[in-house]
Amino acid sequence: MAKQKFERTKPHVNVGTIGHVDHGKTTLTAAITLILSKAGLAQAKGYDEIDKAPEEKARGITINTTHVEYETAKRHYAHVDCPGHADYVKNMITGAAQMDGAILVVSAADGPMPQTREHILLARQVGVPYIVVFLNKADMVDDPELIELVEMEVRDLLNQYEFPGDETPIVVGSALKALECGCGKRECQWCGKIWELMDVVDEYIPTPERDIDKPFLMPVEDVFSITGRGTVATGRVERGKVKVGDEVEIIGLTTESRKTVVTGVEMFRKTLDEAQAGDNIGVLLRGIQKDEVERGQVLAKPGTIKPHTKFEAQVYVLTKEEGGRHTPFFNGYRPQFYFRTTDVTGTIQLPEGVEMVMPGDHVTLRVELITPIAMEEGLKFAIREGGRTVGAGVVSAIIE
C-alpha cells in the first residue's frame, strides 16, 4: 500500500500528557483520539495500543513512548504519552519528544502527587513553555468544593515553578466516562469536556516559531581550504537561513568570537542562493584561515548566542543495562561533555547534600568546562567517558 503523503495544511504543534502515575494520562490520550475520530480528525487508538509503548533509542538511551497524531479544526498535533515515570524523565531530558505544550493530568479524587510536582519542575527546567490542566476522574468526586480545592492546589503548584497558575486553563472531566460513552457530541456531559480541553489546547498553547524563522545557527562539522577561494566550513543548518553576503560569527572553543562574511554557499557541490534549517551545506568564509575555524564551533547570526563555560544542567545517568557506568560518580567527576559535534572536558559539582550519583538517577548538576561552547538554555548534550555515553543532559541555566 502506498504511503499517504503528509499534507501540511494546518500549523503543527507537539504536545504530550504529563502527571502522576495512574492519574489517567493514557486514558485521556485514548479519549482524545476517540472523540476526535467521531469528527474525522483522528484515528481512534485504544488504551492498550497506547499503553504498550514501543521501545525507542534516543542517544543510546532506551525510552518507551507512544506517539499519536490528531487534528482539531485549527491545527495538527503530534501527542506523546509515556507509560513509566522514568520514561518521562528520560524523554524530557533527551528531548526525544520535544513538547511545545503539555497537558497535565491530575486526578480530582487524589489531588497533586509527588510525580505531579516532579513533572511540573521538569517541564520548567527543560523548557516546556505552556501547560494546560485536565482534572480527571471528576465522576468519582461528589463534592464540588473538593474539586475547587484540588484546582487551587494545582494552581499553587504551577505558581511555585514559575508557570502562570492563575491564568492556566483547567478543564474538569472524566477521560474514562468519555471513552465509555464515545458519542463524541459537544453537548455530552463527558465527551464535551474532551472538546473543551482541545479548544483550550488550541487557544492557550501558541504555535511555535518554526526553526527556519529563528536566527541562523550551524554547528561546524568539518573545515576545508579551497585553493584560490578560501576556507569552507561544512555542517547541517540547525536553524534560520544563510545566504551570500550575510555576516556570521564564529563562536566557541575560544573566548574571542570572530565575525566574517559568507562569500559562498554550496549544497551537493552546487551553489545555492540561500540555505535553510535542515540543509547540509558548505559555507565559504571571507578572510578566515583554515586554522581559525574548527569542528565544535558554530556559525551564527552575530550577537544571537555566546560562548560559556559554567552552567547548570538536568542530567539522566544511564544504567548499566543501557551501557552506562556500573558504579556511582562523586563530586569533582571529570568526564567529556559532547555538545553538537565535539567533546569538551568538564568538572561536575553535585548539589549540596548529594554525596554521589548512581546509574539510573536524575540529578541537577553544575558543570565547568575547560573551553567555552556556544550555549543557551535548552541545549542538549551527552556525557561521555572514553567514547561511550554515560549520561544525557540539558542546560537548564547558564552561570557564566
Swiss-Prot record:
Mg(2+) binds at T26. Residues 19-26 are annotated as: G1. GO terms for cellular component: cytosol. Residues 81-84 are annotated as: G3. It catalyses: GTP + H2O = GDP + phosphate + H(+). Residues 10-209 form the tr-type G domain. Gene3D superfamilies: P-loop containing nucleotide triphosphate hydrolases, Translation factors. InterPro entries: EF-Tu_GTP-bd, EF-Tu_GTPase, EFTu-like_2, EFTU_2, G_TR_CS, P-loop_NTPase, Small_GTP-bd, T_Tr_GTP-bd_dom. Residues 136-139 are annotated as: G4. It is an enzyme of class 3 (hydrolase). Residues 174-176 are annotated as: G5. It is found in: Cytoplasm. The keyword Transferase does not apply. GTP binds at residues 19-26, 81-85, 136-139. SUPFAM superfamilies: EF-Tu/eEF-1alpha/eIF2-gamma C-terminal domain (SSF50465), P-loop containing nucleoside triphosphate hydrolases (SSF52540), Translation proteins (SSF50447). Its EC number is 3.6.5.3. GO terms for molecular function: GTP binding; GTPase activity; translation elongation factor activity. GTP hydrolase that promotes the GTP-dependent binding of aminoacyl-tRNA to the A-site of ribosomes during protein biosynthesis. Belongs to the TRAFAC class translation factor GTPase superfamily. Classic translation factor GTPase family. EF-Tu/EF-1A subfamily. This is Elongation factor Tu-B.
